[in-house]
Amino acid sequence: HDALPICAGQVGAAASYLLSSTPGISDIVLVDVDPARAAGEAADIGHAAAFGTAARVQEGSYADLAGAAVVVITAGASLKPGQTRLELLQQNLRIVDHITEQVLRAAPDTILLFATNPVDVMPAIAVQRWGVAPGRAIGTGCTLDSIRFRDRLSHHLEVSPSSVHAYVLGEHGDSEVLLWSGAQVGGLPLLDFAQQSGRPIDAALQRTMAEDVRTAAYRIKAGKGVSNFGIGGCIARLVRAMVGDERSVFTVSTYLPELLGVQRTCVSLPHVIGRTGASTPYLPPLADDEATALRASAEVLAQTIAGGLQALEDRA
């Protein structure tokens, strides 16, 4: 199988729908605690896929995971209005820990792609608790935040998002760090391009844009109750990069023994994504304030990971 989303909820269904029309993806299996829901989603998505690539989409069980290239874990409670991703930890940790155990029994060599929040904690649990190699336990991390950053910049500058190279690092959440110092458009530093184009970006606008990116999910959920298509698109894009061995660069989250003096954390940094999962992360040059913010973000996640591991051990 190419990809097996675990959970046929809003995010899993959106990801599966997009994967069904992704070049190179021919086989998708949905696994859910509610088999009828998974079967219904699989049939509906399969009918849509028949218009294009005709990828095979079906409902299955953990036994069907054997040989899967990628297993995408989206199961868990969703973010409620006013709730932070880290506050979801206690609700989702036991669910994802149990799923991870079942997946590894059936497919010990698969790549685990986590989309369940808090998405930066789950890869660390897989590495520290289940011994998964860091490059094969991947969180979608700040992939979506980076896209939101580029989208916001592209609208302001009136250029295509594909011409904007800008990344968000750290936590997929409130402590994330927008990398202004390394952002470029057309080979020019972002702020130089903005100035020359007559659309300058001053400190006040930077703060506004950063807040827009950071709170995008909260606004979406306040309006429609769920954020699913953006993250579904990220999942599909990452799976495509893995299955196709693209070696494309994305800001995903992986477990790090040490970062900027912080031990045993898991944050988003640029990684090369291909058939074997995620490469060793790359730490880009940082301005002093960006380094300070990234260190603080890494510390928040290190403490959360330690607390999550302790909670699982206490329940054992």
Regions found by a protein language model. Give the residues of each.
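Short, small-residue-biased leader/transition segments that mark boundaries at the very start
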Residues: 1-4
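Glycine-rich Rossmann-fold phosphate-binding loop(s) that bind the pyrophosphate
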Residues: 8-9
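N-terminal Rossmann-fold NAD(P) dinucleotide-binding loop
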Residues: 12-13
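Conserved S-adenosyl-L-methionine
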Residues: 21-27, 131-134
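Conserved N-terminal Rossmann-fold NAD(P) cofactor-binding segment
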Residues: 27-69, 83, 302, 306-313
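Rossmann-like NAD(P)-binding element
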Residues: 50-111
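Rossmann-like NAD(P)(H) cofactor-binding subdomain of soluble oxidoreductases
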Residues: 85-151
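C-terminal substrate-binding/catalytic lobe of Rossmann-fold NAD(P)-dependent dehydrogenases
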Residues: 130-136, 145-316
